[in-house]
Regions:
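Mixed-charge (Asp/Glu-Lys/Arg
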Residues: 1-37, 42-170
């Protein structure tokens, strides 16, 4: 399938995220309008609420910390990115790469701290601004021969959702 615009990726990612939370039985509220600060969705379970920032991608990666990189190393950029995000906001990472329009994308849930740990470990520990779903570094790269991969436990599931609500629910 040909690539779609970043706007279509974002709208699709938010719609899939809202749908999957609802499908698991959570109440979902969607923010509409210009980019809202910090989060795109709110999901509730009883008295617990999660603020959810949705990030969509169609290339196997999510660029997250580039805006913090100017004049510093990857680890400092990641620390700045982490400081800018509330620790109770979770990320819903939606990946459309290698999916047909009528197929579900892969969906992952992670906290800012979990993402920062992956970014810092990326490229053999050098760090990176991009979170990769599954990327092996080539022979000329800083992390030559290493593979960055989203942990399997981040894949959305009833267990992952229960963990997120019990750990990060407000």
């Amino acid at each position: 399938m040909k690539a779609i615009s970043s706007w279509h990726v974002g709208v699709s990612a938010e719609a899939y995220a809202a749908a999957i939370f609802a499908r698991y039985g959570y109440d979902v509220s969607v923010q509409y309008g210009a980019n809202q600060p910090e989060y795109d969705l709110i999901a509730t379970s009883g008295d617990l609420m999660l603020k959810i920032s949705v990030k969509g991608s169609q290339d196997g990666s999510w660029g997250l910390t580039q805006g913090y990189k100017k004049g510093c190393d990857y680890h400092t950029a990641t620390a700045k990115w982490l400081a800018a995000h509330h620790k109770k906001t979770i990320f819903c990472l939606v990946q459309f790469k290698d999916t047909a329009p009528n197929e579900m994308p892969r969906i992952y849930l992670a906290s800012p701290v979990e993402i920062a740990e992956r970014l810092n470990a990326s490229a053999g520990g050098r760090g990176e601004t991009i979170l990769y779903e599954n990327h092996t570094w080539g022979p000329r790269a800083a992390g030559s021969g290493t593979t960055d991969r989203i942990p399997d436990e981040w894949m959305i599931s009833a267990e992952r959702l229960a963990y997120m609500f019990s750990t990060y629910g407000q």
